[in-house]
Swiss-Prot record:
GO terms for cellular component: cytoplasm. Pathway: Aminoacyl-tRNA biosynthesis; selenocysteinyl-tRNA(Sec) biosynthesis; L-seryl-tRNA(Sec) from L-serine and tRNA(Sec): step 1/1. This is Serine--tRNA ligase. Belongs to the class-II aminoacyl-tRNA synthetase family. Type-1 seryl-tRNA synthetase subfamily. L-serine binds at T231, A232, E233, E285, S385.
Length: 427
């Protein structure tokens, strides 16, 4: 959520910056009119309250003098009724203003590239050596089906499309990756491990920016106030909703594994095979709460932590600075990390690392105090995938596949796989 004071002071300047996102900002056009109406209503209420106070004093004076006070009494009742109606109208205007604020995206940071499409994203660095094959590499869905480490058909029977059963060494590889990522982030990168709920309430989804704008993308539990988590970012960030943190606790860093649930409402026909786009998928998340003056340094740190997973797995990747049109609703600056998929001949997103500045903290009421007498300030929140597990499985299957159909297990995962070095073709 944007700072309403800043919006009042620099409406045209903010609107110009938001226009670089290329989104529909028609709701924002009502802000000046509603803000003027809000001020007028507040002034009118104050005038009527002053008149009512004056009438109340008259009543007291008349009663002291044992004179007729019926006129002022009727006047206070009339003014009270009018104030009540104005207060109700003011609440409606403020609710509409709040809805506008909740629907406006974050202001892009000055370092975010200005662009109109994903083609305007800027490549920051490419890391690793792409594998060379003396055979035609297979797509990861063919690799895993040939190895019989997933069962898509039965998942379709049990649930539907965009679900998968991992089995055997496929299930173990998924679990190995989760444990490896969590160990790396908690033991070496200094994140505190949490295991969050898989359901959250509406306030939590609003706090991190999924609601109200993206409700159609979420899975809501019928006849309840609960949503299945689209990412562990939601429960973990909301751990500190409506809290004032002491400065000495910052930065706070959490890592969390969770299953994630997304409707993929706008993805019909895209990535219908394989592990890239599932309704349910596992992900390891990184979340940081930091002081405002440190947040961009902290974004580089967090992004490096996500990259380290790929480096240790030996997977080639690139880092992109996302342009204004491809930034996402809540981010002021975002890096996407994309892993090389040799059979597809493209890089595919495996992590997004974002600085939300105070956008989420303002929605969720997450503040800190620099000392006991200081006024509370909003923290800056950051998050990133560290990493999406299914997509990491897909990348390993494509990059480590062998001519005989087997897949070499990255060395760093072997302790988590009982020392096994390969996933062999079944007999």
């Amino acid at each position: 959520m944007l700072d309403i004071k800043r919006l009042r002071q620099d409406f045209e300047g903010i609107k110009e910056k938001l226009a670089h996102r290329g989104e529909d900002l028609s709701a924002l056009d009502r802000f000046p009119q509603l803000e003027e109406k809000r001020r007028d209503l507040i002034n009118e209420v104050e005038v009527k309250k002053a008149k009512r106070n004056e009438a109340t004093k008259q009543i007291a004076e008349l009663k002291r003098n044992k004179e007729d006070a019926e006129g002022p009494i009727l006047e206070t009742r009339r003014l009270g009724d009018e104030i009540k109606l104005l207060d109700e109208e003011l609440r409606e205007v403020e609710a509409e203003l709040n809805l506008i604020l909740l629907s406006i995206p974050n202001i892009p940071h000055e370092s975010t590239p200005i662009g109109e499409t994903e083609d305007d994203n800027v490549t920051i660095r490419e890391i690793g050596t792409k594998p060379e094959f003396d055979f035609e590499p297979k797509q990861h869905w063919d690799v895993m089906e040939d190895l019989q480490i997933v069962d898509v058909e039965r998942a379709g029977k049990v649930t539907g499309s965009r679900f998968v059963f991992y089995k055997g060494l496929g299930a173990r590889l998924e679990r190995a990756l989760i444990n490896f990522m969590m160990d790396l982030h908690s033991d070496e990168h200094g994140y505190a491990e949490v295991l969050p709920p898989y359901m959250v309430n509406r306030d939590s989804m609003t706090g991190t920016g999924q609601l109200p704008k993206f409700e159609e993308d979420a899975f809501k539990v019928a006849d309840t106030n609960y949503f299945l988590v689209p990412t562990a970012e939601v429960p973990v960030t909301n751990m500190h909703r409506e809290e004032i943190l002491p400065e000495t606790q910052l930065p706070i860093a959490y890592t969390a594994y969770s299953a994630n649930f997304r409707s993929e409402a706008g993805s019909a026909g895209r990535d219908t095979r394989g592990l890239i786009r599932q309704h349910q998928f596992n992900k390891v998340e990184l979340v940081r709460f930091v002081k405002p003056e440190e947040s961009y340094e902290q974004l580089e740190l967090l992004t490096g932590h996500a990259e380290e997973v790929l480096k240790r797995l030996g997977l080639p990747y690139q880092v992109l600075s996302m342009c204004t049109a491809d930034l996402g609703f809540t981010a002021a600056k975002k890096y996407d990390i994309e892993v090389w998929m040799p059979a597809q001949g493209v890089y595919r997103e495996i992590s997004s690392c974002s600085n939300f500045e105070d956008f989420q903290a303002r929605r969720a009421g997450i503040r800190f105090r620099r000392d006991a007498n200081a006024k509370p300030e909003f923290v800056h929140t950051l998050n990133g995938s560290g990493l999406a597990v299914g997509r990491t499985v897909a990348a390993i299957l494509e990059n480590y596949q062998q001519a005989d159909g087997s897949v070499v297990i990255p060395e760093v995962l072997r302790p988590y796989m009982g020392g096994k070095e390969k996933i062999e073709m079944p007999n």
